[in-house]
Amino acid sequence: MFKYKQVMIVRSDLKLSKGKLAVQVAHGAVTAAFKAYKEKPEWFKGWFNEGQKKVVVKAESERELFELKAEAEKLGIPNSLIRDAGLTEIPPGTITCLAIGPGPEEIVNKITGNLKLV
C-alpha cells in the first residue's frame, strides 16, 4: 500500500494523440515533483522512496483543471499546470494537463478520487 501518490489530469476535450498526451503527462509529473521537492521535501522523499506512484486521469475541460488546481492550492498540495508550446498539434499556450502531488494519498484522493482513468 502506498502512502503517497501523484496524479496527472489531462483534458479529454483536446483529443490529443497518444504521444502528445504522454509528453504532457511527463511535463506535469516532472514539474510538480520538482515543486514538491522544494516545498514539501518530506512528501517528496516518502513518495520517491516508496516507488513514485503515479496515476493518469481525465477532466472534461480547461475550467475543470482550474477548479481542481484551486482545490489543490486550498489543501496545500504542490501542483503544476502545463501549457503547451504549440509546436505540433495544438495552439501555443493551450493548457493540457494539471499534475497534483506528490502528496499524501488520502489528501490527493479528496481532489482526484472521482475522476476516471485515461
Swiss-Prot record:
It comes from the Archaea. GO terms for biological process: translation. It catalyses: an N-acyl-L-alpha-aminoacyl-tRNA + H2O = an N-acyl-L-amino acid + a tRNA + H(+). It comes from Thermococcus sibiricus (strain DSM 12597 / MM 739). This is Peptidyl-tRNA hydrolase. The natural substrate for this enzyme may be peptidyl-tRNAs which drop off the ribosome during protein synthesis. The gene is pth. GO terms for cellular component: cytosol. Keywords: Cytoplasm, Hydrolase. It is found in: Cytoplasm.
